[in-house]
Amino acid sequence: MNKLAIEIVTPNGSIYSETEAELIVLQTESGEMGVMAGHIPTVAPLKIGAVRVTKPGNDKDYIAVTEGFAEIRPQQVSVLVQAAEQAEGIDIERAKESLKRAEARLNEDKAAHVDFHRAERALHRAINRIEVAKFR
């Protein structure tokens, strides 16, 4: 089976790199997208979600990502996002605290001038981190 390289990059640098991927699954704005070697060149907007990388032997890596873009070429996928964490690096307790804070902000009185869009994004990020951490 042909292999595919993937790199996940944030403004702070490369977070994840793999050169032997068999399948990469991305959460795009239009739905889940599976990418294998030889995929047609594409640029896809990503939503908050998990990137799943299947390696030889059916080993899988899971990476929680925020919104961003994926540039897909026949032998390479470049994921550009604001933040990303590998499942092994996620502090579940910290993610649960973030979830509680986001829920509290969303439940505040509208007179408090809460930025609901920002609070909702924080809620989705926290939920995603907790879900991805389950794959450690």
Swiss-Prot record:
Keywords tagged on the record: ATP synthesis, Cell membrane, CF(1), Hydrogen ion transport, Ion transport, Membrane, Transport
Protein species of origin: Macrococcus caseolyticus (strain JCSC5402)
Domain of life of the organism encoding this protein: Bacteria
Any one Gene Ontology cellular component term annotated for this protein: plasma membrane
HAMAP family documented for this protein: ATP_synth_epsil_bac
Stated family: Belongs to the ATPase epsilon chain family.
Gene: atpC
Gene3D superfamilies membership: ATP synthase delta/epsilon subunit, C-terminal domain (1.20.5.440), F0F1 ATP synthase delta/epsilon subunit, N-terminal (2.60.15.10)
Membrane-topology annotation of the record: Peripheral membrane protein
GO molecular function, one term: ATP binding
Compartmental location: Cell membrane
Signal peptide: none
Protein name: ATP synthase epsilon chain
Function: Produces ATP from ADP in the presence of a proton gradient across the membrane.
